[in-house]
Amino acid sequence: MQPRRIARELALLGVNQLPATAAKLSEKQLEDLLLAAIRALSEETHETLSTAAAEIQRSDRLLHESDPLLLADSDPKEEGGSRSVTLRLHQAQRHLQRLEITLKEAKVPNPNALRGEVLELIQQVQVALSNAGQALEHLEQRLHSVRHILDEVVQLSQRAVNRVGVALSMPELLYIAQSQEVRAYALQLLTALRTHKEAIDARLQKALVGWQLQRVGRIERDILRLAVVEMEILASSPVKVAINEAVELAKKYGDPEAAAFVNGVLRRVVDSQMETHRGRDPSLPGSGSGG
């Protein structure tokens, strides 16, 4: 794992604990914020594993629920079983064979008797085919139910596997989070954000289309702020790297639409920066650099 990636994550977890007042934070206070962020990561590991276990249990329960639907096929009289459909189709086939034999052996001098027998056989075939069609509909409903259950089982299992993968990476993350390099960069991000928060928010507000920054979700808002810190204030990461890292954080901590939203806003921030590249925006000390 890259130290800076972990530092960004720690900073994101620590942002929410920054005081609302403009008072300067001491180094000790910032260190305490990072320790709280590390504890939050540890708690997240346990929660992730618990959620994965619950999803596996639900998958197992759903599979058991699908058994009666599949076992119904073993009874030829059970509506909706594949054997029931086959039985009814064979019945229709026998009626058709009888009809064929009757037509071949028909005696022309007695057309009325032939007509009556043929009509009766045709009616029997129609009934048999109708029954087979109904049985097919029942079977399709059963298969649809089973397919729906299996789809949910696959989704739950995949989520559980993903959660376990995240949890397995946590010990390494927690270990690296203790390093001086990681803590120093996280402190740098938090300090810059605390110092230039108003200017950063003004920059982001300009890039938002039809949104107010304060109405954006807290996680997404903090991710955007930290990305602007890296791109424009500290100029510590190339623009592409800062945006990509922000998108990854949004995928991990935001809702399903967060990543696309964060990417779009930051792209507009960069476009705005390029438009004013020939001059310096006085609202940001590092504006125009860090590309």
Curated annotation (Swiss-Prot):
Involved in transcription antitermination. Required for transcription of ribosomal RNA (rRNA) genes. Binds specifically to the boxA antiterminator sequence of the ribosomal RNA (rrn) operons. One of its GO terms (molecular function) is RNA binding. Keywords: RNA-binding, Transcription, Transcription antitermination, Transcription regulation. Belongs to the NusB family. This is Transcription antitermination protein NusB. The gene is nusB. The keyword Signal does not apply. SUPFAM superfamilies: NusB-like (SSF48013). One of its GO terms (biological process) is transcription antitermination.
